[in-house]
């Protein structure tokens, strides 16, 4: 995070307030991410150009200018509320194969709600010195939830469905040629994968980001017109991302029955990721006032945060696919050969040999 602010305003008579408690609807500054939130005092919601003002909110916006306030203690306590929606459009062509929502482009809607976004600014002025501290959510500030997941999630499901249908068609073609029955269907029937790549699934995603910032510093008044500030902000990052894709069905076939019929979650995808870290931001500032004019500048150095990652992920059990596919083919073919008059033992042996020939065919593997 790095910000550089330079501004000036024509000074007017300021009313000093020792304690301010306010509530306001936050601007989209609390959208999240690694950028610095600038609405760290509710006065920002009333007027965004605060960087050259002299007031208690200057502990963040103009820390060098706070020393020009009256002597004694100054405190501001802020409570903000944020609500916003995020809409992501995706026009991936295969979304039309979704049997529950066969349209494209598709809009994936997320909702973010943060009922309490607290912050405070404190200053103690004595003589030429001003000791200051503040706390705020310098980044992030809430949780965004996508009840139907994201387009990138559905894209994986749509492509998986097409790949499954393609594999099913190839297996059926090779199987039919091997048995001398072109057009034979085992996996491409409407009761199985089908041939259109149709799919259904359930999905969910939420992300939470909080970057807590605690700043301390001091300003010194060199003259009645000029002051300077130096301080540091410590930032503690805490984030979480959680999402899943489950109950994937290709055609009328639950995908887990092919991957591992003994585990209903064999085809599920799940992500749970926690991140945390600490960083520090050096801050310097100057303020110069003359007559009815006030000039100020503040520079925040880049904050370097090394995030520690803890993830618990679940991916589909693809490794069991060949064995499960083989068992299904052997079982189905055994029944076919038994119906043609073979003994169960011979039918199973022929079914096993046929399955081996099909699955090792160059068109399948």
Placement of each model-derived feature along the sequence:
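Solvent-exposed loop segments that connect transmembrane elements
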Residues: 93-103, 149-201, 238-273, 307-365
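Residues that define the transmembrane beta-barrel architecture of outer-membrane proteins
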Residues: 57, 113-118, 210-214, 276-282, ...
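Membrane-embedded beta-strand positions of outer-membrane beta-barrel proteins
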Residues: 75-79, 133, 218, 230, ...
């Amino acid at each position: 995070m790095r910000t550089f602010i330079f501004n000036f305003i024509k000074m007017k008579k300021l009313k000093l307030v020792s304690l301010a408690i306010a509530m306001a609807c936050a601007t989209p500054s609390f959208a999240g991410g690694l950028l610095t939130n600038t609405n760290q005092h509710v006065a920002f919601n009333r007027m965004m150009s605060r960087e050259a003002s002299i007031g208690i909110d200057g502990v963040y916006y103009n820390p060098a200018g706070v020393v020009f306030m009256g002597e004694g203690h100054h405190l501001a306590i802020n409570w903000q509320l944020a609500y916003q929606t995020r809409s992501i459009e995706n026009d991936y062509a295969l979304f039309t194969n979704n049997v529950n929502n066969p349209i494209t482009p598709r809009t994936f809607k997320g909702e973010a709600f943060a009922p309490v976004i607290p912050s405070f600014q404190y200053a103690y002025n004595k003589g030429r010195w001003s000791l200051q501290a503040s706390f705020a959510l310098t980044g992030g500030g809430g949780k965004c939830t996508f009840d139907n997941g994201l387009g990138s999630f559905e894209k994986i499901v749509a492509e998986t469905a097409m790949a499954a249908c393609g594999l099913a068609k190839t297996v059926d073609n090779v199987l039919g040629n091997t048995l001398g029955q072109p057009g034979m269907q085992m996996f491409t029937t409407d009761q199985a994968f089908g041939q259109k790549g149709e799919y259904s699934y359930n999905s969910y995603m939420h992300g939470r980001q909080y970057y807590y910032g605690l700043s301390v510093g001091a300003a010194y008044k060199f003259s009645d017109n000029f002051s300077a500030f130096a301080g540091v902000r410590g930032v503690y990052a805490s984030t979480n991302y959680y999402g899943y894709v489950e109950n994937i069905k290709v055609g009328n076939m639950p995908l887990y029955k092919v991957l591992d019929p003994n585990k209903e979650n064999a085809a599920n995808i799940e992500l749970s990721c926690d991140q945390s870290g600490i960083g520090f931001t050096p801050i310097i500032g100057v303020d110069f006032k003359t007559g009815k004019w006030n000039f100020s500048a503040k520079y925040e150095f880049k904050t370097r945060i090394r995030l520690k990652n803890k993830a618990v992920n679940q991916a589909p059990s693809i490794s069991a696919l060949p064995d499960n596919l083989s068992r299904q083919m052997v079982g189905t073919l055994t029944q076919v050969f038994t119906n043609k008059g073979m003994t169960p033992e011979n039918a199973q042996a022929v079914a096993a040999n046929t399955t081996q020939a099909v699955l090792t065919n160059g068109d399948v593997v």
